[in-house]
Regions:
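A short glycine-rich, Lys/Arg-flanked "PGG" loop and its adjoining helix->strand segment in the class I
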Residues: 150-164
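Conserved class I S-adenosyl-L-methionine
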Residues: 52-64
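Class I SAM-dependent methyltransferase SAM/SAH-binding core
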Residues: 59, 66-125
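A short acidic, Gly/Pro-enriched loop at the edge of an enzyme's catalytic core
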Residues: 121-136
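Extra-cytoplasmic beta-strand recognition segments
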Residues: 334-362, 393-397, 401, 407-411, ...
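Short carbohydrate-recognition loop motifs
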Residues: 309-330
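Conserved beta-strand signature within the Rossmann-like core of class I S-adenosyl-L-methionine
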Residues: 165-173
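Conserved Class I S-adenosyl-L-methionine
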Residues: 179-214
Length: 430
């Protein structure tokens, strides 16, 4: 029998049991998206362990108002839902000062509200007694809570509040490489890091992890920020097509990752803890690496049109924008994209004119960061552009792209204030 802990695999959507969970328990149409996979995998695992029995008591952590919690709540005795709820939360699903009322009011289908309680709580410090829950679960939440000591504190707290035979089902970000990627507020975990972390917390993934991937085209990695490469992503047709694009194996920069489901139980005294073995992982890495090479070859020979306003969510396209000199407010800012390892020409093309007749100046820049250290941002090139009157400006920077890094194009006003309109950013082969 294969272990319940496993990597996200496009072939999972062909499993009739998995399909039933999506259609019946989640009440959704199947789509190749790893978030749906996470929800369905957690449900399927809890079901297979006999924990969706109408009497069990469970704990959800970091779930906001996710659909999954309602699917679980209607099949257990009681589900306690926790998150860092608050009106100022950066997460839309957790943006409430009255989580119990808000969560119960947000149910996408009928759920007996007496089976559900929501409260604000830090998953590193669970305010419950010892051994009170039959199961706990979290869906891609742990990677957001900090660093190693935070992850360890969380797992130890879960171990404490679980009954001796309890199960913790979690999904998280899995990097196929040997390194951990400590992105701000979002870690991508390696196999060895998770193995050591789980062992240190006194947990084991009984039977190891199924690391096999089917040779399916939807298992070829694509950029997680694919929308950043499409300036017209807000267009109805483009947006609809993007919503149908597989979101299974992904790239952050040039680094491949996916979702991993771990099914953890308390390690017996003297038993080997951790998540090993991970069956067929090396074969899966070879398949994924071939997909990365294919994407790299495509990117290196293709012109790329970048969305200039990824970092400016409040900007309305087609409306002129007034920006004053500021260190913190960019004129525009693309997302960080992987360009492979060849020389690239970056062309910025836009209408600009000074505000109130005064002169202005803008600085156009290309920034980069190593994919393994996304917090280490450096300037890869810049040019200053004086703005004296209304005109169409076209400037070009040339960079030697490093395939270990990702790049963003941005600008800021360095003097005065100016209007901009019809901004276009293109990356080509010079």
């Amino acid at each position: 029998m294969k272990p319940f802990s496993k990597l996200c695999d496009a072939a999972d959507w062909s499993d009739p049991l998995f399909d039933r969970v999506i259609r019946v328990e989640l009440a959704e149409e199947p789509r190749f998206h790893r978030k749906q996979w996470e929800f369905a995998r957690i449900l399927r695992t809890l079901e297979a362990h006999g924990l969706l029995n109408g009497t069990s008591h469970g704990l959800s952590m970091g779930g906001g108002d996710e659909r999954l919690l309602y699917s679980v709540a209607r099949r257990v005795g009681h589900l306690t839902v926790t998150d860092l709820y608050g009106a100022g939360s950066a997460w839309e699903g957790a943006r409430t000062d009255d989580p119990d009322r808000a969560i119960k009011a947000s149910a996408p289908f009928h759920v007996d509200s007496s089976r559900l309680t929501a409260m604000r709580m830090d998953m590193r410090s669970l305010e419950f007694g010892n051994g009170v829950f039959d199961f706990c679960y979290s869906s891609c939440a742990m990677e957001h809570i900090g660093e190693y000591e935070d992850f360890l504190a969380h797992l130890r707290e879960v171990r404490r509040v679980l009954k001796d035979q309890g199960v913790y089902v979690l999904t998280t970000e899995f990097h196929y490489g040997d390194e951990v990627i400590p992105a701000p507020h979002n870690y991508y975990f390696s196999a060895s890091f998770l193995d050591g972390l789980v062992a240190a917390a006194g947990f084991e993934a009984r039977g190891g992890v199924d690391g096999a991937l089917s040779p399916h085209v939807f298992n070829r990695p694509i950029p997680a920020n694919l929308r950043d490469l499409l300036p017209d992503a807000a267009d109805a047709v483009t947006g609809r097509l993007l919503d149908s694009t597989p979101h299974v194996q992904l790239l952050t920069g040039g680094r491949p990752f996916t979702s991993l489901c771990l099914v953890l139980t308390k390690a017996a005294h003297g038993a080997s803890a951790g998540i090993r073995p991970i069956a067929d992982l090396e074969a899966s890495r070879e398949f994924i690496d071939e997909g990365v090479r294919r994407w790299k070859a495509f990117v290196e020979r293709s012109p790329l049109n970048l969305d200039p306003f990824v970092a400016e969510c409040g900007h309305t396209r087609g409306v002129p924008r007034l920006v004053a000199a500021s260190e913190s407010s960019p004129l525009f800012h693309t997302g960080y994209v992987w360009l492979g390892g060849v020389t690239r020409a970056v062309t910025i093309d836009f209408d600009a004119w000074p505000a109130a007749g005064s002169g202005a100046e803008a600085e156009l820049r290309v920034h980069r960061h190593p994919d393994l250290r996304p917090d280490e941002v450096a300037c890869a090139g810049s040019i200053r552009v004086p703005i004296h009157a209304r005109e169409r400006l076209r400037r070009q920077l040339q960079i030697d792209a490093d395939d270990r890094c990702s790049y963003a194009v941005l600008a800021r006003v360095t003097r005065g204030a100016c209007w901009i309109d019809d901004m276009r950013v293109q990356v080509t082969i010079p």
